[in-house]
Amino acid sequence: MSNTTSSIITIGREYGSSGRQIGQEVAKYFGIKCYDKELLEHAANDSGICKELFEHHDEKPTNSFLYSLVMDTYSFGYSSAGFNDMPMNHKIFLAQFDAIKKLAGEGPCVMVGRCADYALSDWPDCFSIFVHADLDVRIRRIASKYGKSDREAKDLINKTDKSRASYYNYYTNKKWGSAKDYNLCIDSGKLGLDNAAKVIIDAVQIFDASKKK
């Protein structure tokens, strides 16, 4: 099969599952860009909100303020009074939402996290993936990568996953990591990073071929 793709590939991931690294390998194979924290920079540039605020609120859970009001205000754009009065975490989410759609409109790419699968749920070219791994595998990876004890690594994993799940569940009204909400779920602990990337590449190529029928 060709090593090109016409798809936008979104990757949700458990912390320590190496979803970002796998996404980078997939992007490298197809010769397309991989956006992870780069999404924050694009959103900051487009919205005029400083990048540090995006980093502070990145995939952090929110509270108060009804989701429906956020999305109602979204339809009026950044210049509306409603947007100006909105809490900063909601401004951040909507700016990222727009940046994701804008980058997807520029062509095939890989997007990691930040509810990209939800932002592009109505795009026929979007292929959504969730990468997970057993907790003990992730503990070893994080402990080795950051020089932490197993207990410290476990605490960081639990904290980060809880934050990502709360953020995703709040803004999408779906359940983070639920298999039925993704086109493909893959265990990077069982397969290893290289094989996980290969499985994703094969799946995307099959998806691309199905669109031509």
Q: Could you say what each language-model-derived stretch is?
A:
Residues 4-13, 107:
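Pre-Walker A (Motif I) flank of P-loop NTPase domains
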Residues 11-24:
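Glycine-rich phosphate-binding P-loop
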Residues 33-44:
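Short beta-strand-centered segment that lines the nucleotide-binding/catalytic pocket of NTP-utilizing
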Residues 59-70, 74, 149-193:
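Small-molecule kinase domains that catalyze NTP-dependent phosphoryl transfer to phosphate-bearing small molecules
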Residues 97-101, 170-213:
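NTP-dependent small-molecule kinase module
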Residues 103, 115-122, 141:
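RNA pseudouridine synthases
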Residues 122-145, 150-158:
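Conserved phosphate-donor/acceptor-positioning beta-strand/loop module used by diverse small-molecule
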